Amino acid sequence: MLPAISKSVLSLDVGKRRIGIAGCDPLGITITQLEAIKRTTFNNEATQLRQLCDLRDVRGIIIGLPLSDLGKETKQSSYCYTYGINIAKELNLPLAWVNEHSSTWEAGQRFKLQNDRSGKLDSAAAALLLEQWLTEGPELEFLKN
């Protein structure tokens, strides 16, 4: 019998002020909302994410892309796409993107966090992204240099 492929991944909801974070166990059963990272410099964010990846034995990164109502690229989705590429290269991890259209609104409704400014809403949105990825994919991919 082949060993199960670890689904220990982090999901990132990349915003202008914070990066919401959620993780799951290696079997992809339990999703945990983690403390959001306050945006500073890329190097500082990468250091914090690397420590978290080491602590949780992370095998991949999921990045939310805030596409438009019609599924088209937006200014923020373009920024998140570039950030995803840069952080995946920095952490040497495969990644996948999921459409996060309305994820923050949905997280606010589902978890009663509509007026949150602490970062809990960002991490709740990241948890929804991870839930979506676990059920729909796509597969993680290493970037080609």
Swiss-Prot record:
Gene3D superfamilies: YqgF/RNase H-like domain (3.30.420.140). It is found in: Cytoplasm. It is an enzyme of class 3 (hydrolase). Keywords: Cytoplasm, Hydrolase, Nuclease, Ribosome biogenesis. One of its GO terms (biological process) is rRNA 5'-end processing. PANTHER family: POLYNUCLEOTIDYL TRANSFERASE, RIBONUCLEASE H-LIKE SUPERFAMILY PROTEIN. This is Putative pre-16S rRNA nuclease. It comes from Prochlorococcus marinus (strain MIT 9211).
